[in-house]
Design a protein with these regions (language model features):
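Short, flexible helix-adjacent loops and helix caps
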Residues: 24-28, 88, 114
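A structural signal for well-ordered alpha-helices, especially hydrophobic packing surfaces
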Residues: 16, 20, 73-76, 80, ...
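Aromatic-residue detector
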Residues: 36, 43-44, 85-89, 101, ...
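Generic intrinsically disordered, low-complexity segments enriched for polar/acidic and small residues
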Residues: 4-11, 41, 55, 72, ...
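Amphipathic protein-protein interaction modules
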Residues: 49-104
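Short terminal alpha-helical segments
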Residues: 1-49
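Amphipathic alpha-helical segments that form well-ordered structural scaffolds
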Residues: 105-109
Length: 114
């Protein structure tokens, strides 16, 4: 049986890789007609928890990694509300500058783990 620590770490890795991937790769990760941005961000949010509490509880993380993760988390959190609904609900937005920044921030977190 998989431990909670392993479960959340695997979900964390998957969500970071999905956030960092190109529009084409993102769309291939989920069933056709999915709201890709929303689904990936929901997976990420489930992995890290509110205020990153799951990270602190289940994942061993350095201060540098945590700083980069906080940057990503703050950026995603800052794109909430009606004004940014298109980012999460419209697959055509996956190439927009906001998603390019999410990819860059997610890749920085990934690289910090290597």
């Amino acid at each position: 049986m998989i431990s909670l620590k392993q479960y959340y770490f695997d979900k964390f890795k998957w969500s970071l890789m999905a956030l960092a991937s190109s529009k084409k790769k993102k769309k291939n990760l989920l069933p056709e007609n999915s709201m890709v941005g929303e689904e990936i961000v929901l997976e990420y949010e489930e992995a890290v928890g509110e205020n990153l509490e799951r990270i602190h509880e289940y994942i061993d993380i350095t201060e540098k990694q945590l700083v980069l993760l906080r940057d990503l988390d703050a950026y995603i959190s800052g794109k909430s509300g009606e004004k940014y609904a298109y980012l999460w609900l419209e697959n055509s937005s996956l190439d927009d500058s906001e998603w390019q920044e999410i990819r860059r921030l997610a890749m920085a977190v990934i690289l910090a783990f290597h």
